[in-house]
Amino acid sequence: MAKFDHFNLLGPFYDWIFSLRNSSKLVKMVDLFPQQALLDIGGGTGRVSENFSGISSSIFVADPAIKMLREAHKKGLMVIIANSEALPFRPASFERVIMIDAFHHVAQHQLTLDEIWRVLKPGGRLVIEEPNIRNIFGKLIAIGEKILLMRSKIIAPEEIISMCAFQDVENIRFVIKSALVWVMIDKRA
């Protein structure tokens, strides 16, 4: 069955409909420094990335939805049309990679993590924020996205961590706060 292109339809209105929660907590988790490059995968309109624009001038938003990226471009962010399973960057290109409320939308979770790990520099950090599938709100999101025919599969943080069995993982942890989960993975320097 063909999937409806929700994100290109929502592009011009997305920021108005969905506000960013916990931006100060996220900025602290990511721990971006001025000379570091940040990649926001599935970053759409740049609503998350713009919180880092005062810290670093090397911020890229990668997303397959062109209309979402147009909104990010209006914010002065560097944009690239890309799927998470085939990132058009050289190995070890970014000190920080974030994927906020997007991991459950990808078609191939393991391939996405493999690609992220490939473009993440040694000493870099990956931060994934997802709905907490064990919370009633996370379950409602999963049901709602299924009803809307979205290609979504919300994964528990332990399963995401088990997919990150890379040789050069230095530190891996997750934080659960009611409806949200953050998975943070540091790559050995």
Question: PLM features: residue spans?
Answer:
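Class I SAM-dependent methyltransferase SAM/SAH-binding core
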Residues: 39-86
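C-terminal lobe and adjacent flexible extensions of AdoMet/dcAdoMet transferase-like proteins
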Residues: 184-189
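A conserved beta-strand element that flanks and buttresses the S-adenosyl-L-methionine
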Residues: 98
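C-terminal alpha-helical "lid/dimerization" subdomain adjacent to the S-adenosyl-L-methionine
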Residues: 11, 17-18, 48, 127-167, ...
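Conserved class I S-adenosyl-L-methionine
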Residues: 1-33, 47-48, 141-142
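A short glycine-rich, Lys/Arg-flanked "PGG" loop and its adjoining helix->strand segment in the class I
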Residues: 110-122
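Short catalytic micro-motifs in class I SAM-dependent methyltransferases
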Residues: 101-102
